[in-house]
A protein has these predicted regions:
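Transmembrane-helix boundary motif in ABC transporter permease subunits
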Residues: 2-9, 70-102, 114-118, 128-129, ...
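Interhelical loop and adjacent transmembrane-helix boundary motif
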Residues: 10-13, 50-55, 210-265
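Transmembrane alpha-helices
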Residues: 20, 73, 99, 103, ...
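Periplasmic/extracellular loop-to-transmembrane helix junction in inner-membrane transport proteins
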Residues: 3-10, 36-73, 88-89, 236-239
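C-terminal transmembrane helix and the adjacent membrane-cytosol boundary/short C-terminal tail
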Residues: 9, 16-20, 31, 93, ...
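Membrane-interfacial helix termini and adjacent extracytoplasmic/periplasmic loops
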Residues: 3-7, 45-53, 58, 93-94, ...
């Protein structure tokens, strides 16, 4: 094990901390995850596949993927816009915008779902007006999209803001002075500089969107085969719960692997850039 020569703590303390960390990871993450896969596969692969391919499960998987596919691109646009606004402009009320950005982190997802019900429910003025025109939000896919969008909104912006603040505006200003317009500056200067942070934000957004339960549970109505996502089907279908849970676990692990790959690629490029400057 490599140690920092500047650290003076005794070796036994390092091993103690490593042991505590490993014990925590085993008890809280590895063992429960292994238990999920064990229960999912205990009846054999045929039962496992049947649990994932029955019509209700397919509908839940499809809805989960649709929600993520819609929410992630929208969050990419909104996150970039919010990060640009908060890092490139000074205006009255900027601190309020920054505070509101973190609202989905502090508000319970159940409360967030209830907010949408109170706003778009059939017995509200706006919800009644929309339903009279054939647009149903609550207990339908649009409500699921809105609730998921709310709880995932901060992830992209919060990844971009620190990076954009650290990078400053010098390169963008130079591009404008040299005659680039706003779009050229964004595509050739800003986006390449923030692409890794943007990818991290999108990965986190996708993971949260696929696993969201509380807010979506309130607005979905649990209509079987129509508005149930994978987490909700895990709750109401005990026989298929472990199979569906294992699917969510696989998606989560794939997300972590992708994030690790992107981190390694970024570190290699940063190291190569540092060597080229020497």
């Amino acid at each position: 094990m490599k140690t920092n020569p500047n650290i003076t703590e005794p070796r036994w303390l390092q091993w103690l901390l490593i042991g505590i960390a490993l014990a925590f990871l085993l008890l809280m993450l590895v063992i429960p995850l292994m238990a999920v896969f064990y229960e999912a596969l205990r009846e054999g692969w045929q039962t496992y596949l049947e649990s994932l391919t029955n019509p209700e499960a397919r509908a839940a998987i499809r809805l989960t993927l649709i929600a993520a596919a819609i929410v992630v691109p929208i969050n990419a646009v909104l996150g970039i816009a919010m990060a640009w606004l908060l890092t490139r402009f000074d205006f009255r009320g900027k601190q309020l915008f920054t505070t509101l950005l973190d609202l989905p982190f502090s508000v319970s997802p159940v409360v967030a779902g209830l907010m949408f019900v109170m706003l778009f429910g059939a017995h509200t003025a706006l919800g009644g007006w929309l339903e009279a025109r054939g647009v149903q939000i609550i207990f339908a896919i649009p409500g699921i999209i809105l609730a998921t969008l709310f709880v995932t909104f901060p992830f992209v912006a919060r990844e971009l803001i620190p990076l954009m603040q650290a990078q400053g505006e010098s390169e963008e200003q130079a591009a404008l002075i040299l005659g680039a317009n706003g779009w050229q500056m964004f595509w050739r200067i800003t986006l390449p500089n923030i692409k890794w942070a943007l990818l991290y934000g999108l990965i986190l957004t996708n993971a949260r969107a696929m696993g969201e339960f509380g807010a979506v549970s309130v607005v979905s109505g649990h209509i079987r085969g129509e508005t149930n996502t994978i987490p909700h089907l895990v709750e109401i279908r005990f026989t298929a719960a472990f199979a569906l849970s294992s699917l969510l676990a696989v998606l989560a692990i794939a997300t972590l692997v992708l994030q690790d790959i992107l981190t390694r690629i970024q570190n290699r490029k940063l190291a190569a850039a540092a060597r080229s400057k020497q």
